[in-house]
Amino acid sequence: MKAAVYCFGRFQPPTIGHAKVFDAVARAARTYNADAYMFASQSHKKTKFDNKSCNPLLYDMKMDYLKKMFPQYASNFVVDKSVVTFLHAATWLYMKDYTHLYMVAGSDRVGSYTEKLNQYNCQPDKSGEIIFCFRSIEVISAGTRDPDADGAQGMSGTKMRKAAQDLETTAFMSGIPNTLSIDQKLELMHDVRAGLVLPKENK
């Protein structure tokens, strides 16, 4: 048995809340004697802070921040531009000869990820190709997020993008782990703002 545990997320921007997901990946890896991998979306689109397609940070920039913010997992982050979706990540792991796959996701996404991964497991895709064929697949919940809670439990990318837009420096920096210096936190806020369509009053 050769097992892998992975997560896939937007991380726009990375926050203290994402530690919950990464920690869950690490725990699952220990539980199942598996290797841990963390993938990030490459999506980048300059829109308003609350747009669902808002992805202000470029991929390479985001991966650099992730490694600095979560140095304990720096070796687990995968930087590979051939991996665009969570299905590509599964294929990437299958090509590494893993036979058992575990994915960690938010509680609200467990069902949809389970359905999609099983839909393609050992089954041809639209082009007739089998992109992966694991002996077993399981999607594990990283827990729920309470948007009204303080700290990591209630942190979200939307809150962080709004704080960056409104130049709410204290609020923005409170959502970033202290593995970044104050100057680095301010630089991240600047980079997020640069990737947003800002209202005239916030420019």
Task: List PLM regions with ranges.
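Nucleotidyltransferase catalytic core that binds NTPs
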Residues: 1-203
